[in-house]
């Protein structure tokens, strides 16, 4: 599991400013009238945003997600004893090599049902000792990659997956048991189950289902795959990482079976100083591509409950609570308490619900047009107009665009303005304008599928430029 200390939870904090007594800094002007608080919240422009309802194909996909299949995959992966990155790659029944062979065969079974749309490959490299204390001898690191080609926009990729390597208390113990049931057979099981189901469908954009290796040594497999895509100029629009999605119970026994955490990077790690300055100038530090992807997921997938250094947008799903007596622990009993990442800790119903959230996300992303590009808002006009412009995305045809907005205290988009198929818009509201709310612009495609929103960056020119 990747430490959450390097990531930010995809949510905003509500700040409430309160004083025990009124503050009147200008006593000489005490007769001056001030705006009534009844004017807040702001009047609505457009309409209230509603969560996306699954279409018939997505409903069918969700109905096919099998708890039994997910459980079977997790138990099988745990049965290899250890899947440590440094463990045997030749033993037919124990170690990461045996797990890789089995996973490859299972992904290939899915591909065989796809009528040629899905292919299965390995993304492999040799990692040498030197700059990583958890690599003590040269080792082959292989990610299993199942690629389902898009039917209309195959050059736009969306990727999801978990890591199939595991570890125990000692990060370089590659011989001792490390069943890795929750961390992260639970994530790999989701990736494999969705590959099995999606192979029978034709998403418009390409979807990649993966099982990464080398995660416990520092996200090595995921980083190499992302760099491979970058070197090949692949348009990887989003990466959805599944790292521990199988247990809702905390160490103190608290359960939270109907929530899942979503970690989203703030200001992109690869963003240059000039872009960051522009972002901060308009208060956009909470509207990075990853966080707007998180808002998209909240909109399209929340109903299912009832990779950064390469410059790609990525988020990570993880269960609501963690129990550190199970995670990265030797399989042992101490003082009558069982330790270790064992299958007995799994909540398979929870794992299945998590799979439905991911399925909703991937299907909705792959069937929507790409997000608009070069999205801007004119910040030079000192008036109540908010002038926007953007460019149409490549790939799938766009039926129209929407402006989303939310008050600055809101974590999620609350309202939407339907614009039609235009590439600029003047919002003339005296209250809903660039000084009062956060805006985003998104594409709308056939069937009402929508892209994640894009934060408009500042530009300056005469009106209607």
Curated annotation (Swiss-Prot):
One cellular component (GO) term of this entry: extracellular region
Domain Fibronectin type-III: 371-464
A Pfam family assignment: Peptidase_M28
Organism phylogeny: Eukaryota, Fungi, Dikarya, Ascomycota, Pezizomycotina
Binding site for Zn(2+) 2: 183, 216
Signal peptide: 1-20
Cofactor requirement: Zn(2+)
Main location, first listed in the record: secreted
Keyword Hydrolase: yes
Family membership noted in the UniProt record: Belongs to the peptidase M28 family. M28B subfamily.
Compartments where found: Secreted
PROSITE patterns named among the record's database cross-references: FN3 (PS50853)
EC identifiers of the protein: 3.4.-.-
Annotated Zn(2+) 1 binding sites: 163, 183, 243
Keywords annotated in UniProt: Glycoprotein, Hydrolase, Metal-binding, Metalloprotease, Protease, Secreted, Signal, Zinc
Protein name: Probable zinc metalloprotease PTT_17836
Gene Ontology biological-process entries: proteolysis
GO molecular function: metal ion binding; metalloexopeptidase activity
Glycosylation sites: 140, 231, 272, 330, 378, 384, 421, 426
SUPFAM superfamilies: Fibronectin type III, Zn-dependent exopeptidases
Cofactor binding comment, as recorded: Binds 2 Zn(2+) ions per subunit.
Species annotation: Pyrenophora teres f. teres (strain 0-1)
Enzyme class: hydrolase
InterPro entries: FN3_dom (IPR003961), FN3_sf (IPR036116), Ig-like_fold (IPR013783), M28_fam (IPR045175), Peptidase_M28 (IPR007484)
């Amino acid at each position: 599991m990747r430490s959450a200390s390097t990531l930010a939870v995809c949510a905003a904090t509500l700040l409430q400013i309160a004083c025990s007594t009124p503050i009147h800094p200008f006593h000489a002007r005490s007769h001056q009238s001030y705006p009534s608080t009844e004017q807040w919240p702001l009047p609505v422009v457009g309409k209230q945003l509603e969560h996306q309802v699954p279409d018939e194909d997505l409903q069918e996909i969700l109905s096919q997600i099998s708890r039994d299949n997910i459980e079977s995959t997790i138990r099988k992966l745990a049965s290899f004893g250890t899947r440590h990155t440094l463990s045997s790659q030749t033993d037919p029944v124990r170690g990461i090599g045996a797990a890789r062979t089995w996973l490859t065969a299972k992904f290939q079974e899915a591909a065989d049902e796809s009528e040629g749309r899905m292919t299965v490959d390995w993304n492999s490299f040799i990692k040498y000792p030197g700059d990583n204390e958890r690599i003590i001898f040269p080792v082959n690191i292989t990610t299993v990659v199942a690629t389902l080609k898009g039917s209309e926009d195959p050059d736009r990729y969306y990727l999801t997956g978990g890591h199939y390597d595991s570890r125990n208390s000692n990060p370089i113990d590659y011989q001792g048991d490390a069943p890795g049931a929750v961390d992260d057979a639970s994530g790999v099981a989701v990736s494999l189950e969705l590959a099995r189901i999606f192979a029978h469908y034709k998403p418009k954009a390409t979807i990649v289902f993966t099982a990464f290796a080398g995660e416990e040594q520092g996200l090595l497999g995921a980083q190499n795959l992302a760099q491979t895509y970058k070197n090949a100029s692949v348009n990887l629009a989003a990466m959805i990482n599944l790292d521990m999605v199988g247990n809702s119970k905390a160490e103190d026994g608290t359960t939270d079976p109907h929530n899942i955490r979503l970690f989203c990077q703030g200001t992109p790690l690869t963003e240059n100083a000039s872009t960051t300055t522009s972002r901060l100038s308009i208060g956009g530090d909470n509207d990075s591509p990853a966080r707007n992807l998180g808002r998209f997921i909240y909109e399209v997938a929340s109903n299912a409950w009832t990779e950064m250094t390469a410059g790609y947008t990525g988020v990570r799903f993880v269960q609501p609570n963690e129990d550190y007596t199970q995670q990265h622990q030797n399989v042992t009993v101490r003082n009558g308490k069982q330790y270790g990442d064992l299958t007995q800790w799994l909540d398979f119903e929870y794992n299945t619900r998590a799979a439905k959230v991911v399925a909703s996300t991937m299907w909705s992303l792959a069937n929507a047009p790409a997000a608009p590009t070069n999205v801007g808002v004119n910040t030079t006009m000192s008036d109540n107009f908010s002038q926007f412009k953007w460019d149409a995305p490549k790939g799938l045809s766009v039926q129209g665009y929407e402006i989303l907005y939310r008050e600055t205290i809101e974590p999620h988009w609350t309202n939407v303005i339907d614009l039609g198929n235009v590439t600029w818009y003047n919002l003339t509201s005296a209250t809903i304008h660039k000084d009062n709310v956060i805006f985003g612009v998104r594409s709308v495609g056939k069937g009402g599928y929508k892209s994640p929103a894009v934060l408009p960056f500042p530009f300056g020119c005469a009106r209607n430029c």
